Amino acid sequence: MGPEVLLRLDRDGPEPLRAQLEGGLREAIRAGRLRAGERLPSSRELARQLGVSRGLVQDCYGQLYAEGYLTARVGSATRVAATAPARPAPAPAERPAAARLDVDFASGVPDLAGFPRADWAWAVREACRTVANADLHYGDPRGDRTLRRVLAGYLRRVRAAVAEPADIVVCTGFAQGLGLVLRALSRSGVRAVGFEDPGYGQGETLAAVTRLGIEAVPVPVDEGGVDVAALARTGVAAVVLTPAHQSPTGVVLAPDRRHALAAWAADRDAVVVEDDYDAEFRYDREPVGTLQGIAAGRVVLLGTVSKSLAPAMRLGWVVCPPHLTEAIVEEKRLSDRGSPGLDQLALARLIESGRYDRHLRRMRGVYAGRREALAGALARHAPGLRLTGLAAGFHAVLHLPEGVREADVVAAARERSVGLYGMSDFRMSGGTTPGQLVIGFGNLGEPAIERGVAAVADLLTGKPGGHAD
């Protein structure tokens, strides 16, 4: 009995098709209707049988593979795992160990206490007061038209982007936005995509790329940003970049490379996916405009409020080149029925009112103070160490002395209840040389920064001699 007989998808129901398909397959496996070792149809065949996109089926298979329900090997069929779980894995009872650290220098975390609660509450009230009844129905998969209009104006004004409301797709953050773009590219025949190295490392982002059947190709980064000549040698037809503030090195893509990248995309008929990471927080000068602004027809621009407001917001956007808009909108439509409508309208009100800009100005001051606190603490407790990437964002790169092993420092710091994170986490190879640490300070007050640096200073310098309590 094949899955096409076991599954019924309700296209008019409130549950997204992907969730229905995943749930139906899980239940069929747990109930024994799909037995251990049984072969499942290919993603292409099941998509045809169910009348859904192949990308949706690939995502479902990938999720169930990760949960242990399915097995697959390159060149062979997807099958029900011999030891498929009898029930979904229970949710963890507590936060990961990092939550118990006294000082956690994790990168990518903004000041959670700085979330503008009063302004957001005002924006939500305004959204509820002014929303039209018709806008409470299922809407355009691109997102709320008011937010798309406001975002287009904001991105043109602040990021020098070429943005029209019709070409903006609202999503639930960077992960979904990138997934939409990559699925659209995959459907057009793209099989390999370049990624900055160091960049996303071996984490969830690249695992998701692999599940789509796309090869992630490393492209080296140096002090000028991504190496465009090396990119050209890979032969890929798409690349994902963080040009405004490279994650994690903190460098800005050099002007000559910006133009070389635009020329490469035009000559290769390639697509550049621009992750506008940390662009709001620049300390030494005005932020550089988007790459999309000089090559709009070749660049997909991704942005979110996860760093500017809070990760829990789950709101982002994709500014599509016109030739990709329809495909990306279709992927969004197949993924879900759209992002939360009232939250979208509230964000539009927050931006229109000027409260969002005011919040960003305030947070720039907060992060600038913490940036100075980090540099000062290192100068006092571990003088002579090189710190780079401080011109923007809320993390920096600490270069360890020769002979000091990154992994040893990370492990020993954790014994002292301090979370440190090596550059190896961000390298696709996992390599640990040269030894570097990515030091996040966004969610740490200045006293915690001082305390954390003092606690591990001897580890950083490789000169044992005790540490401050």
Language model regions located:
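Active-site PLP attachment segment
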Residues: 293-327, 339-342
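N-terminal basic, amphipathic alpha-helical segments
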Residues: 1-127, 136, 145, 188, ...
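Residue-level detector of anion-binding/catalytic polar loops
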Residues: 70, 215, 271, 418-419
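Hydrophobic residues in well-ordered beta-strands that form the structural core
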Residues: 195, 218, 274, 347, ...
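Helix-loop "lid/cap" segments that line or gate small-molecule binding pockets
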Residues: 107, 151, 317, 345-353
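Short glycine-rich anion-binding loops that position phosphate/pyrophosphate groups of nucleotides
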Residues: 108-111, 243-247, 307, 444
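Conserved core of the PLP fold type I
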Residues: 124, 129, 134-268, 280-282, ...
